[in-house]
Amino acid sequence: MKKLFLLDAYALIYRAYYAFIRVPRINSKGQNTSAILGFVNTLEEVLRRENPDYIGVVFDPKGGTFRHKLYPAYKAQREETPEDIRFAIPYIKSIIEGYRIPVIEVENYEADDVIGTLAKRFAVLIPPVFEPFKTINL
């Protein structure tokens, strides 16, 4: 059976960033590259261990989603994205493109909405790096 992997970019980026929060990875220019390093390590692990036939990395869109229009207070209590993560996003997108992996971003829809919609058409496998999410029912 062919395997399709759809990765939620921001879930991985936040996970990577906070994994190094006590010992951040700082480059020679003084920039925190923790999110970049952690994201690439996870991507490499998925590619090596799972050898997917197809893979895509799904990002949340800029400017919010239909939920923000329906309910302006949606996620209003969340803290602002850390500057180090905002700094990392263009680099991560460039790296993904360097791997020749599609970057998927659908206007008005969060990454998990896109992943859930696409997953309904495929057999769903959750790689070991995502063990905590195995309880999700699609």
Model-assigned labels for residue ranges:
Residues 2-125, 130:
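Noncatalytic, basic helical substrate-engagement surface that gates or grips nucleic-acid strands
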Residues 128-132, 137-138:
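Conserved RecA-like ASCE P-loop NTPase motor core of nucleic-acid helicases/translocases
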